[in-house]
Amino acid sequence: MKRLWDISPPVSAASPVFPGDTPYQQHWKWSLTPDCPVNVSEIRLSPHIGAHADAPLHYSNGAPAIGAVPLEPFLGPCRVIHALDCGPLILPEHLRHAADGLPPRVLVRTAEHAALDWWTDDFSAYAPHTIEWLAERGVVLIGLDTPSIDPASSKTLDSHHVILRRDMRVLENLLLDDVAEGDYELIALPLALAQADASPVRAILRELG
């Protein structure tokens, strides 16, 4: 059997969210008792918690919701590239060492350890021209191990708007701590949420061959 890597962080009340966004909340609607045959919970959360896929609707009014986005970009050959300690922005120079023959999907690991249970504004994001550089090489999906492809302080979301213009897809908040550089098969399908601006994904990598 081919090896799998689970690159989705656990989702719980401790999961970090952007300040002001909705944290994970869960309570039990029904509990298993002699009079009730099941446990059923109610969950409230931001669709941007944990590993998730942004929809174009997230950064453009009237653009498609995540349930209307084609699934093909979220499934297929992928390359993981390490850009550890790249600083605030991922630049082409951080990726060139692994850029020969890029597959259509690129995930970048920027940190030794992902922030699983604390929020920090000090995370790495994509420089907009890096996304252009990847798009010119046939990349249709990018991802990373931080909360956003734009800096936390950005009010213009320049990298998101490159994604929009290039009709690319994005995965954020991935857990790449234990993944070596190299090529894999990515499987990270969003839910068919008809009106949502994003969706949680259970992102995994599978060895090729």
From Swiss-Prot:
<keyword id="KW-0823">Tryptophan catabolism</keyword>
<dbReference type="InterPro" id="IPR017484">
    <property type="entry name" value="Kynurenine_formamidase_bac"/>
</dbReference>
<feature type="binding site">
    <location>
        <position position="52"/>
    </location>
    <ligand>
        <name>Zn(2+) 1</name>
    </ligand>
</feature>
<feature type="binding site">
    <location>
        <position position="172"/>
    </location>
    <ligand>
        <name>Zn(2+) 2</name>
    </ligand>
</feature>
<dbReference type="InterPro" id="IPR037175">
    <property type="entry name" value="KFase_sf"/>
</dbReference>
<feature type="binding site">
    <location>
        <position position="160"/>
    </location>
    <ligand>
        <name>Zn(2+) 2</name>
    </ligand>
</feature>
<keyword id="KW-0479">Metal-binding</keyword>
<comment type="subunit">
    <text>Homodimer.</text>
</comment>
<feature type="binding site">
    <location>
        <position position="18"/>
    </location>
    <ligand>
        <name>substrate</name>
    </ligand>
</feature>
<keyword id="KW-0378">Hydrolase</keyword>
<dbReference type="GO" id="GO:0019441">
    <property type="term" value="P:L-tryptophan catabolic process to kynurenine"/>
</dbReference>
<dbReference type="GO" id="GO:0043420">
    <property type="term" value="P:anthranilate metabolic process"/>
</dbReference>
<dbReference type="GO" id="GO:0004328">
    <property type="term" value="F:formamidase activity"/>
</dbReference>
<feature type="binding site">
    <location>
        <position position="48"/>
    </location>
    <ligand>
        <name>Zn(2+) 1</name>
    </ligand>
</feature>
<feature type="binding site">
    <location>
        <position position="172"/>
    </location>
    <ligand>
        <name>Zn(2+) 1</name>
    </ligand>
</feature>
<dbReference type="GO" id="GO:0004061">
    <property type="term" value="F:arylformamidase activity"/>
</dbReference>
<keyword id="KW-0862">Zinc</keyword>
<dbReference type="Pfam" id="PF04199">
    <property type="entry name" value="Cyclase"/>
</dbReference>
<protein>
    <recommendedName>
        <fullName>Kynurenine formamidase</fullName>
        <ecNumber>3.5.1.9</ecNumber>
    </recommendedName>
</protein>
<feature type="binding site">
    <location>
        <position position="54"/>
    </location>
    <ligand>
        <name>Zn(2+) 2</name>
    </ligand>
</feature>
<comment type="pathway">
    <text>Amino-acid degradation; L-tryptophan degradation via kynurenine pathway; L-kynurenine from L-tryptophan: step 2/2.</text>
</comment>
<comment type="function">
    <text>Catalyzes the hydrolysis of N-formyl-L-kynurenine to L-kynurenine, the second step in the kynurenine pathway of tryptophan degradation.</text>
</comment>
<feature type="active site" description="Proton donor/acceptor">
    <location>
        <position position="58"/>
    </location>
</feature>
<dbReference type="InterPro" id="IPR007325">
    <property type="entry name" value="KFase/CYL"/>
</dbReference>
<comment type="similarity">
    <text>Belongs to the Cyclase 1 superfamily. KynB family.</text>
</comment>
<dbReference type="GO" id="GO:0008270">
    <property type="term" value="F:zinc ion binding"/>
</dbReference>
<feature type="binding site">
    <location>
        <position position="54"/>
    </location>
    <ligand>
        <name>Zn(2+) 1</name>
    </ligand>
</feature>
